Amino acid sequence: MAPKKKVTGLIKLQIKAGAANPAPPIGPALGQHGVNIMEFCKAYNAQTEAQRGNVIPVEITVYEDRTFTFILKTPPAAELIKKAAGVAKGSGTPHTVKVAKLTMDQVREIAEQKQADLNANDIDAAAKIIAGTARSMGITVEA
């Protein structure tokens, strides 16, 4: 077994799928850890090509020899909720001004998609988390 590489940094970014480029915020974040920025951009764009239009969070682990590995996460719940509700952004005052409505089926669908990244044991608990996020954005969840 090869000796373990020493980790020197962990970078978390949220980048549009298939649209990573060396411009800020990606360039400076990777540059200060000595990562080859173009190499990361090409690899990220290749892996996220199928999900164009979504924002995909990525966790980049940088090693001592300046190599890196990255893990793609599921899109943020807020992004999925906005897409399902068909709104550009949540409400500025969520408890007084409601901007859209979601059905429980839509919430369950988002919960299934996010299940891997959520701290929930079953789909019902995940749906409750998603419903809470929707409410905090000024989106009504109908039972």
From Swiss-Prot:
Pfam families linked: Ribosomal_L11 (PF00298), Ribosomal_L11_N (PF03946)
Example of a GO cellular component annotation carried by this entry: cytosolic large ribosomal subunit
One biological process term in Gene Ontology: translation
Domain of life of the organism encoding this protein: Bacteria
A GO molecular function held by the record: large ribosomal subunit rRNA binding
PROSITE patterns: RIBOSOMAL_L11
InterPro entries: Ribosomal_uL11, Ribosomal_uL11_bac-typ, Ribosomal_uL11_C, Ribosomal_uL11_C_sf, Ribosomal_uL11_CS, Ribosomal_uL11_N, Ribosomal_uL11_N_sf
Protein keywords: Methylation, Ribonucleoprotein, Ribosomal protein, RNA-binding, rRNA-binding
Free-text description of this protein's post-translational modifications in UniProt: One or more lysine residues are methylated.
Record SUPFAM superfamilies: Ribosomal L11/L12e N-terminal domain (SSF54747), Ribosomal protein L11, C-terminal domain (SSF46906)
Protein family per UniProt: Belongs to the universal ribosomal protein uL11 family.
Function of the protein: Forms part of the ribosomal stalk which helps the ribosome interact with GTP-bound translation factors.
NCBIfam families per record: L11_bact
Self-association state and partner proteins as the record states: Part of the ribosomal stalk of the 50S ribosomal subunit. Interacts with L10 and the large rRNA to form the base of the stalk. L10 forms an elongated spine to which L12 dimers bind in a sequential fashion forming a multimeric L10(L12)X complex.
HAMAP family xrefs: Ribosomal_uL11
Record-given protein name: Large ribosomal subunit protein uL11
Protein's gene: rplK
